[in-house]
Each structure stands twice: as C-alpha cells, then as structure tokens.
C-alpha cells in the first residue's frame, strides 16, 4: 500500500466516525438541483507527506495527475484567473461570460509588491528567496486578500504556502480553510507535491516534507456512500514520479515534463457530484 492511501483512509474515517454534521443548519453550498449540500466535518486535519520517500498519489481511486498539474501551472505559473487558459472545465461554475473568476487565485499571485531587492510578484519572490535567502523564515505566499474578496467569484480554499529550507531539503506547508475531501483532498496533495518538486529542482534543492493543514475538512452528504466504497478498494504500491531534470527555469515547465510510472488504481464507476 502507499502512505498516501493510508493517510486518505485515516482522514476519511476520522471525519465519518468523529465528525460533526451540519444537517440542521442553513448552509451556503448546494447541489445543481438546488438541494442544500450538507456535510460531516472535522476541525483541523493535519497530514504530513515525506516527498523524498514516495509520491503522494492515492491508488484507492484515480487522481487525474495531468489535470491536477495543469491547474497548478494555471495558478502558479500562468498566474491566470481566466478558465480559457485552463485545459479543463472544473472552474466553469465560477466563471463569468468572459471566463474570469475575478481577482482570485492566480491573479493574486501575480500582484507585484516592492521590496528592498526590487519589485516581485509572490511567485517570483519565493523563487528569489529560495536561491538567494534559503535560510529565510519569511518565504511564503498568501492569496486571501481581504480588500479583493468582493471581486472574487470564489474565496480561495487553499490560500497560503510557507516554504522552509532545512539542510538542503525544501519543505512546504499548505494552509487550507476548507476542503471537499472526496473531490479535492488528494488532488490538492498531488498539486502541491509537484509544486515543491518544481521549486526544489530550479533552486538546486532536494524535496523534503509536505504538510497539509485543513481547517474545515468535510465530506458532503451525497459523497458518504462513495467514500465508504472507496475505502474498501484494494491498495497498490505508490507509483514512481518522474520529472524532466533538464528544466532549470520554473516558467519552462509544461504538463508534459511530468510522468507517473506503474500507477495502479481502482476505477471509480460512479459520477461524483460537486457542490457549488
């Protein structure tokens, strides 16, 4: 079995067995048919993944590896807030007629600020510090910009990354205010694991730990039977992660620079609804 599978199982079981239901409360999320989307939730789930030991993709069901990378490049590399720059339709529900999701996600990472060393956006500041100030305890990003929330079509869920170099290893902490565990948990883990691999490579570092902190980890009511089924699926060894070692500039990475070898998983036959 993979470590990622065991972490996912433990997280889901903790939510289902020890979580609190909001079925008696008014809620904002709803299903496409207009029915309120209630959840079972746990406060503050913290999971740790040692990226030097295995790539943290689950085998209990398929995580769309290439699509996950495409989205993280859309946010962190393209710094885009337009779904027309994304090769999937997962953001369409939050886009306006022009394709914009407002001043959210990639838009915030692209906003420039002035520092003693010059003007940088958030991504370029991280890249600069990893190469020039690796011992800094100030290497982080935050896209939860209060003054722009009214112009965001969706408030950021995964909103802050803190990077820390220990020895020659790059570690990262992802802070997430809210997470739909079935649809997004391993998706986000895969994305930010890949991001750490990219940043480490272009900075001359090795990958270390990825720590995922989720304030409100929840499972939606219509997802519970699917989660219970997935947790009974067979578990396979973690696949081998491959990345193009010739890429030295973060902005040169493409989806084609990443591969998984021997990725085994159980196919999920049921369609997963997404609450909006």
Outline where the language-model segments fall.
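Terminal, non-catalytic protein-protein interaction segments that mediate quaternary/complex assembly
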Residues: 1-276
């Amino acid at each position: 079995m993979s470590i990622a599978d065991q972490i996912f199982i433990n997280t889901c079981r903790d939510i289902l067995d020890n979580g609190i239901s909001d079925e008696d409360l008014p809620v904002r999320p709803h299903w496409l048919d207009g029915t309120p989307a209630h959840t079972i939730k746990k406060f503050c789930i913290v999971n740790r993944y040692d990226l030097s030991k295995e790539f943290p993709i689950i085998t209990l069901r398929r995580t769309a590896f290439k699509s996950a990378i495409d989205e993280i490049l859309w946010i962190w590399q393209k710094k885009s807030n337009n779904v027309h720059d994304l090769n999937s339709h997962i953001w369409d529900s939050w886009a306006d007629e022009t394709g914009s999701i407002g001043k959210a996600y990639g838009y915030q990472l692209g906003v420039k600020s002035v520092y003693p060393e010059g003007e940088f956006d958030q991504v370029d500041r991280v890249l600069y510090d990893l190469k020039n100030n690796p011992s800094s305890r100030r290497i982080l990003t935050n896209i939860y910009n209060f003054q722009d929330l009214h112009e965001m079509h969706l408030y950021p869920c995964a909103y802050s990354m803190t990077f820390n170099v220990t020895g020659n290893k790059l570690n990262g902490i992802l802070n997430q205010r809210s997470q739909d565990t079935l649809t997004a948990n391993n998706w986000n883990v895969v994305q930010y694991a890949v991001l750490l691999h990219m940043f480490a490579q272009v900075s001359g570092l090795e990958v270390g730990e990825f720590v995922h902190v989720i304030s409100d980890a929840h499972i939606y009511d219509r997802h519970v039977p699917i989660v219970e089924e997935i947790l009974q699926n067979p578990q396979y060894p973690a696949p081998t992660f491959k990345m193009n070692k010739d890429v030295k500039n973060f902005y040169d990475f493409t989806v084609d620079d990443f591969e998984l070898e021997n990725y085994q998983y159980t196919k999920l036959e049921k369609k997963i609804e997404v609450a909006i």
